[in-house]
Amino acid sequence: PNIEEIKLWGAIYGAALRPCVPLFVMITGALLLPVRGDTSAFYKKRITRVLYPFFIWSVIYNLFPWITGWLGFSPQIILDFFPYAGEEVMRQSFSVAVKYILNIPFNFSILAVHMWYIYLLIGLYLYLPIFSAWVEKASERAKQMFLLAWGVTLLLPYYYQFVDGYLWGTCSWNSFGMLYAFAGFNGYLLLGHYLKNLDWSMKKTLATGIPMFVIGYVVTFFGFRHMTALPDYTDEMLELFFTYCSLNVVMMTIPVFMLAKKVNIRSERIRKALANLTVCGFGVYMIHYFFTGPAVMLTRAIGIPIPLQIPVAAVMAF
């Protein structure tokens, strides 16, 4: 395959899709803030519903290499499903699988990379009732001040990369700087809650949103391309301009959220179909990583043009 062309189209699609995860978090904030009812009931309903499928599917993913060996398959099949799997999993060893499973409470493995979002989601659910108490009583001005402070933190990844690794009190013995309490995905929670009640006309939404999205996309795309053009780059440098909690990604996310608010589906059939899709969404997310590798291989095998391989593979996987 033409590696340079694959990298180009990966950047084109990857940059455009950066708002997806932030949008999910914003929707969570829009729907759940402020939290109603008892905190224990909220935790039981939300976290339990996520925790059990998360653990079961994490175990299945981590057992997969051992199962392929037990069934007599070549280690190559592991790379077919998980192209970035490390050398350790190629051993198809039960002890390696057990090691990965025991590590589930602490982090995801190379075989279940997409589970990073579930750790985040559980953390957000834990935080929501606590954050909600402030959101319920805070004035619009207070919420705006929080979002402003959060906005400043969106520039920190670039400061740390290009200027200095320490800022505002961070040092070798302190990772929690001055604006730490405002940083991270909790800003997206509040942003979703805040924008839910912001009523813009379609004209204003487009006039503001299109330039905002374009600027955010240009920074994301060309920043990523610049990093991948360097002769030597780390994983952190590779992901820098794709960082979800960065200003350029927020600039793409806000217009999409505001535009989505304007969508009014009147067809009852379509509304039911979307509702059913929503019900299945979490399960689809759990299992889809099994299909990404084979889907990409299939698109190449049947001669799908490189510019179309990513969207076609995505449709196959989901």
Model-derived segments and spans:
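Alpha-helical transmembrane segments and their immediate juxtamembrane cytosolic regions
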Residues: 1-318
